[in-house]
Amino acid sequence: MPRVEPCLGYVVGHPEGMILFDTGMGSHPEVDAHYRPRRVGLREALAAIGTQIADISLAANCHLHFDHCGGNPLLGQIPVFVQDTELGTARQAPDYTLPELIEGSRFEQVTGQAEMLPGVFLVPTPGHTDGHQSLIVRRPDGVVIVAGQSHDTATQYAADQLAWQAHRDAHDQPLPGFPGWIDALQQLNPKMVYFAHDRAVWTP
């Protein structure tokens, strides 16, 4: 069934530097023929919000499929944080991603939770890929999560959050399951959760 979906990246402002989370969709003849994307390049997307690649201090990819790391080659020596499991898979597994999107990047490999800047850290959220990660941002007005493709839609996240809540509140069984890391995210009491392929935002 044909569908249209966005492929989103996020910029996080911070007193110690600007963070870019995901860099857009890579280009390849077979990719373009199959997905028929209408791209906004990384430079153009940043310019639309009044910034540029030179303003980015750090970057991260939720995972290394071609639709999340397409702009990585433009980042030069900007450190790109990625789970070591994810990078290992991307380098070794055939047809996992477009190799040219990861060659030459300055990857900072992390294992598990890792702080990028004070109050901004990465947490593993495996499922879509074994090395998938999400970005946690602690703000004065509450916690915001950029969950990448942990879920394709905010509705899917809401279903898992409700399942988590039902288990927590000891509702009668049977109850649906949910990824174990949902508990860690919900313990942060997030005020908003953003996604890579859905413009909708989860809120409590």
Task: List the predicted regions and their residue ranges.
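Metallo-beta-lactamase
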Residues: 29, 38-67, 79-124, 129-202
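A structural signal for short, well-ordered beta-strand segments and their strand-loop junctions
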Residues: 20-22, 80-81, 146, 193-195
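Short, glycine/acidic-enriched loop or turn micro-motifs at the edges of active sites
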Residues: 25-26, 66, 86, 151-152, ...
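Conserved beta-strand hairpin/beta-sheet module of binuclear metal-dependent hydrolase folds
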Residues: 1-44, 134-152
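Metal-dependent catalytic neighborhoods of phosphoester/phosphodiester hydrolases
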Residues: 70-76, 204
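Short His-Asn-centered micro-motif
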Residues: 21, 61-62, 125, 196
